Every structure is written in C-alpha cells, then in structure tokens.
Amino acid sequence: MALSIKPGVRLLGLKPEILVGLQVAEGVYAAHGWTLRLTCGTEGKHQRASLHYAGEAVDLGLPPSGTDLPAFIEELKTALCEEFDVVLEADHIHLEWQVKSI
C-alpha cells in the first residue's frame, strides 16, 4: 500500500467503512504510480455537521499537477460504491462514506 500520512492527522475514531474507501482510493492512486497522502482524518476544524467528526470522512492530497482532475475524480467514484462521495475541493479531495438508503 502506497500511503503516506501527513503529520498531525488523527486516525482515532475512523470507521471501518472509510478505511475500506481509503484502501480503494489508494489502489487508484497506485495505478497511476502515485502515493496517496492522507491529509485529514478526525482532527481539524470543519462544518458543524461534518462527517470528519464521526470518523466517516477523510481528506486526500491532490494528484500531481497536470492531472486531469475531473477525470481522476470520476475514476475514484467509479472504483468506489455509491455509498461514497468524492468531492474535489480547492486543495484536497474530500472522501466520505454516507449510507444513501437502507
């Protein structure tokens, strides 16, 4: 697994489902020869109802400059099931697990 963790990232409380999503995302990064950088877990300041606090969201570092980001986001979405949301933010990729229906 080619994964690096930014210093200060808090892993305590991350749910198994988001860890599975992280593993799938790492595979997508690795297929391009890139290392996935985990930039945020359960720490930091987020919106009040953020899934980071529940351990159901993480932030990923962006791929190298020059990458077609919309295509890469679609690649991540395709690799993950519909219970995951992948959102391109200004300086990271937000990955969250959220059950859509029961």
Model-derived features: positions:
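Catalytic cores and adjacent binding grooves of peptidoglycan-active enzymes
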Residues: 4, 8-12, 37, 45-102
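Extended, low-complexity, intrinsically disordered C-terminal regulatory tails
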Residues: 16-49
